[in-house]
Amino acid sequence: MNTARLNQGTPLLLNAVSKHYAENIVLNQLDLHIPAGQFVAVVGRSGGGKSTLLRLLAGLETPTAGDVLAGTTPLAEIQDDTRMMFQDARLLPWKSVIDNVGLGLKGQWRDAARQALAAVGLENRAGEWPAALSGGQKQRVALARALIHRPGLLLLDEPLGALDALTRLEMQDLIVSLWLKHGFTVLLVTHDVSEAVAMADRVLLIEEGKIGLDLTVDIPRPRRLGSVRLAELEAEVLQRVMQRGHSEQPIRRHG
């Protein structure tokens, strides 16, 4: 196991990270520490820098300035420990389900792929084609494809946004249960504030390239949907999202 990994999760440290596209400043000297194994949700208005942050962590973009670290190691040096899921499952239609899970792997990987499919409840669909699966099942395959690599960091970019309400709740429960079992670090970008407070240990609001709210969600698990405390936290985040202007220092709340 890489020395930057604590427990099974990757600890993250961002020091004064900025990302510019020409004159457009998307992230502006952002500082962030995420302990190993924490589940963090990131919310905010469109264009605020949420997905850019995930792309930096995934190695799909490089920062204009600042450091992105896994503990004391540059995250780019252990990028194989990071996996990312998108709203689109991105399955190859000409490959079977199990071959999509094992995509890019060499050697004896099929047993591990079957175990990953079993973990997401699709062990009986291994030989089928992606076209035979529902949207939720395709996302389960994408999750299995991430799990087979035993990631230290799982990045989720609106992976449930296109699913119906019931399937979305089922996927939320599945992701949380696998996180509790394996202990990897999770960053979830979502526009759904109720999803953020239901799933995460911590909710970050990114606005104007900085962290405008850093909210601890200390509600015991399993969490009961519709609970008063969840509703209160959701209202607090929504109120902050709707505020105009920008605070120089992040507002920290401990629920």
Swiss-Prot record:
Compartments where found: Cell inner membrane
GO CC, alphabetical: plasma membrane
Keywords from the UniProt entry: ATP-binding, Cell inner membrane, Cell membrane, Membrane, Nucleotide-binding, Translocase, Transport
Main location as per UniProt: membrane
EC number annotated for this UniProt entry: 7.6.2.14
One Pfam assignment: ABC_tran
Sequence positions that bind ATP: G44, R45, S46, G47, G48, G49, K50, S51
Protein family (similarity comment): Belongs to the ABC transporter superfamily. Aliphatic sulfonates importer (TC 3.A.1.17.2) family.
Function, in words: Part of the ABC transporter complex SsuABC involved in aliphatic sulfonates import. Responsible for energy coupling to the transport system.
Name this polypeptide is given: Aliphatic sulfonates import ATP-binding protein SsuB
Organism: Escherichia coli O6:H1 (strain CFT073 / ATCC 700928 / UPEC)
Protein encoded by which gene: ssuB
